[in-house]
Amino acid sequence: MEFPETNNNPIITLSFLLCMLSLAYASETCDFPAIFNFGDSNSDTGGKAAAFYPLNPPYGETFFHRSTGRYSDGRLIIDFIAESFNLPYLSPYLSSLGSNFKHGADFATAGSTIKLPTTIIPAHGGFSPFYLDVQYSQFRQFIPRSQFIRETGGIFAELVPEEYYFEKALYTFDIGQNDLTEGFLNLTVEEVNATVPDLVNSFSANVKKIYDLGARTFWIHNTGPIGCLSFILTYFPWAEKDSAGCAKAYNEVAQHFNHKLKEIVAQLRKDLPLATFVHVDIYSVKYSLFSEPEKHGFEFPLITCCGYGGKYNFSVTAPCGDTVTADDGTKIVVGSCACPSVRVNWDGAHYTEAANEYFFDQISTGAFSDPPVPLNMACHKTESLRTLASV
C-alpha cells in the first residue's frame, strides 16, 4: 500500500506554523490599559478651558448637560475611543481639579499647532501656546512625576498610571488643522502648501521622541476637509466651490498635507520597526457628511448649528454661547439649533456629537486605516502578519 507523499521540508513547516500562530494572535483584540492623546480642539477634553477660560453653554448640552471644555455639544471622537475600550474619558493634563490620570491623559488643547504659532493667546486671534513640542514636554514630565506619586503612596497613587501602562497604551494624534488655518489667515494658498513638508517633519520628530519614552502603538488621524467648515467659507467667500459647496483650494491644501503625512507615517514604520503605526483617513469620512449628508442621516452640513448671522449661520463676532446685540438693540444669546442630532457642523469650526459618533463608527472598523486594521487590533503588527500569511 502506497501512502501519499508528504512535504517534510522543515522551513515550509515552520513557516506554516508561524503563520497560523500569527493569524491566531491577530484575532485577539488589544487590551489597552491607557490612552495618551495629543492634538487640538478635535480631541481637547477641556485643556484650553482649564488653562484660559471656560466655554459657555450650549457647549456640552447633548451628553454632559454642561460645558466640559469640549468644542462640541457632546462627546468627541477621543471619547468614543475611550468608551470602546471601557476606559474613562481622558482628563485634560492641564486640569488641576478632579482629574484622574489612572488610564491616560489628554495633552490636546484647542488652537494647538504642530509648529510654534506666530500669534499666541491672549492676543486677538491667537493660537494655543501648547503646540506639539510643548505637549511632548508635558508628557515627558508626566511619566516620572506620576511614578513618584505612585511610589509615595496615599490617596493620589491610584489616580496615576502604573509604569507598564506607558508601553502598553494607545497613543492617539489629531493635529495639523490649525497650522493650515493660521497659514490661510496670513499667507497665500501656495505659500501654505510650501510649509507642509516642514510641518510633517516636525510631527515626525515629536512622534519619535514620544516613542523614545516608551510608546509603541500609534493611531494617527490625518486632517479633515477644512474647506467645508463654515468659518473658512465665511472668511473666504470668493473661493471656488466644489459640488458639495466646499472651498476647493483649501481642501486641496488639506489633501496635500494628508498625502505628506501618510508618507511620513510610512517612513516612521521603517525607522521604528518595533512600533505599530496606523494612519487613519479621517478626511474621507468627514467629507462624506458634506458630500452625501442625507445618505447618512444628516442635513445642512455647511450651516452652523450653534451660530448667528450670515449665509452659513456663522460670524466671528457672534460665536456659539456668546451674547450679542441685534440691530434693534435686542440682546441675543447665540444658541443651538433645534436638532443637533442631525447636524454636522456645531460652531463653525467643530463637529456635533452625532457627527463625531459617525466618524468613530467608520474609522474604528479599519476601513479607513492604513494598514486596514480595526481600532481594537491596532496593537498588532499587521505588516508582519501579511508577510507571514503570504509564505
UniProtKB/Swiss-Prot annotation:
TM region(s), chain numbering: none
Protein name: Esterase
UniProt keyword annotations, A-Z: Allergen, Glycoprotein, Hydrolase, Plant defense, Signal
Protein family (similarity comment): Belongs to the 'GDSL' lipolytic enzyme family.
Entry keyword annotation includes rRNA-binding: no
Sites carrying sugar chains: N186, N193, N313
Entry function: Has lipase and esterase activities. May be involved in plant defense.
Biological processes, Gene Ontology terms: defense response
Record-listed E.C. numbers: 3.1.1.-
The UniProt record lists the keyword Oxidoreductase: no
Signal peptide location: 1-26
Active site: S41 (nucleophile), D347, H350
InterPro entries named among the record's database cross-references: GDSL (IPR001087), SGNH_hydro_sf (IPR036514), SGNH_plant_lipase-like (IPR035669)
Top-level taxonomic group: Eukaryota
Pfam family, one: Lipase_GDSL
EC primary class: hydrolase
Organism for this UniProt entry: Hevea brasiliensis
Post-translational modifications reported in the UniProt record: The N-terminus is blocked. Glycosylated.
GO MF terms, alphabetically ordered: hydrolase activity, acting on ester bonds; IgE binding
